[in-house]
Amino acid sequence: IRYGEVGGVPVEGYLVRPKAARGRLPGLIVIHEWWGLNDNVRDEAARLAAEGFVVLAVDLYAGKVATQPPDAMKLAQALTANPGPAEENLRAAYAWLDEVEKAPRIGTVGWCLGGRWSLRTALLLPDQVDATVIYYGTVKADEGVLARLQMPILGLFASQDRVVPAATVTAFEATLKRLGKDADIHMYEGADHGFANPSGTAYEP
């Protein structure tokens, strides 16, 4: 579905609603890993929609999908170097769920790179996003930044993750608690980065 424009260029994503759904449903912005909007993310979007959400899986790579780590790294680095278009993209996704789908509540969820952007979306729209879920996304214990968060935060991390070390997660959690935020941070012992990806080698069902 085409859900907005970034720099005058249309952006498309994957929209899923529960079968036989009626009325207004809570919305969920789903943000892909560093691979891009691939079949695994579409499957996750469908699974989440079956729980009663209208789900919009965004595409931050303008249609590009990587299958090898070096290619994924290039796409992720380009996104980090120029985050403005991604921010505009995610604002458009929120606006679609809010204005077109009339979702009464809207949350964000993402894995890996998408986990970082799930948190970033919550920081972009702190008075609008109603909940944010971070699966092993890069986080920082910056009080000045995290103070803006106004919604419940769920963080799911892995003890063996070298991308997002346990010490970083501990500092992040401590900062959220010090700020009095509604945060639920889980550290899965023995798990590694990517543990929630059924198509990956680190999957822990």
Where are these regions (language model features)?
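Alpha/beta-hydrolase-fold catalytic nucleophile elbow
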Residues: 59, 109-111, 133-136, 156, ...
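Primarily recognizes the serine-hydrolase "nucleophile elbow" in alpha/beta-hydrolase
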Residues: 90-150
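Short beta-strand/loop motif that positions the catalytic acidic residue
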Residues: 149, 155-157, 161
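Acidic catalytic loop of the alpha/beta-hydrolase fold
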Residues: 160-164, 193
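C-terminal catalytic histidine-bearing segment of alpha/beta-hydrolase fold enzymes
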Residues: 177-205
